Amino acid sequence: MHKTYFIADLHLSETRPNLTALFVDFMQHLAPDADAVYILGDLFDFWIGDDERSPLIDTVKNQIRTLVQQGVPCYFIHGNRDFLLGKRFAGDCGLRLLPEYQVIDLYGEPTLICHGDTLCTDDLHYQAFRRKVHRPWLQWLFRRLPLKVRLKIAQNIRTKSSRDKQNKSQAIMDVNPEFTRRIFERFQVKRLIHGHTHRQNIHQIPPHFERIVLGDWGETASILEVTPQDIRFRQ
């Protein structure tokens, strides 16, 4: 049976081996039967450059490489935690990098996919930070810092982000409905799949739009399975 899987917000790190185990289980037991696998950002808890090496990174590369060698394409859209993941990493394992917005033909239904952070336009502080860290010259400079320095910077940013979230309302950290509606119209689609907010759900939006939100990974995995006949979340 034809099926495509979508995952996001795994936040893999050396400190949470249970998440890596869930990812390996997915890649070895579910993914090989798919037509394609789409990773919609935040595969890693943070990413400081393609020159970093670790057992976790090797494991992820090996799993993606094996899946691709089995004939299942694996696509990736950058998240807010791993936006520096680049062509070197992708080339090592056969991962296909996509732009921040991508329309795909999902069994006859044009479907827009993205990470989702760009939809949260009410979070003005985050959007300003996002614009700053996506400046090419700043990324060029960051990549040339020593690994230890980059790691320290990333850890500080992550700590500050966690602290800032405690002072933000849930509404601010969710998608802006009007902006999201304009995105539907801009790309001329009726279905949108994204992650980032960690609020797993399937929203039906009048008159005919569908917004599917991927969940984050914790005690269990959040996996969206799409077939020509059905859409469902698997755990």
Curated annotation (Swiss-Prot):
GO terms for molecular function: manganese ion binding; UDP-2,3-diacylglucosamine hydrolase activity. Its main location: membrane. Gene3D superfamilies: 3.60.21.10. Pfam families: Metallophos (PF00149). Substrate binds at N80, R81, D123, S161, K165, K168, H196. Mn(2+) 2 binds at D42, N80, H115, H196. It is a peripheral membrane protein. Mn(2+) 1 binds at D9, H11, D42, H198. It catalyses: UDP-2-N,3-O-bis[(3R)-3-hydroxytetradecanoyl]-alpha-D-glucosamine + H2O = 2-N,3-O-bis[(3R)-3-hydroxytetradecanoyl]-alpha-D-glucosaminyl 1-phosphate + UMP + 2 H(+). Binds 2 Mn(2+) ions per subunit in a binuclear metal center. One of its GO terms (biological process) is lipid A biosynthetic process. Its EC number is 3.6.1.54. Hydrolyzes the pyrophosphate bond of UDP-2,3-diacylglucosamine to yield 2,3-diacylglucosamine 1-phosphate (lipid X) and UMP by catalyzing the attack of water at the alpha-P atom. Involved in the biosynthesis of lipid A, a phosphorylated glycolipid that anchors the lipopolysaccharide to the outer membrane of the cell. NCBIfam families: lipid_A_lpxH, PRK05340.1. This is UDP-2,3-diacylglucosamine hydrolase. It comes from Actinobacillus succinogenes (strain ATCC 55618 / DSM 22257 / CCUG 43843 / 130Z). The gene is lpxH.
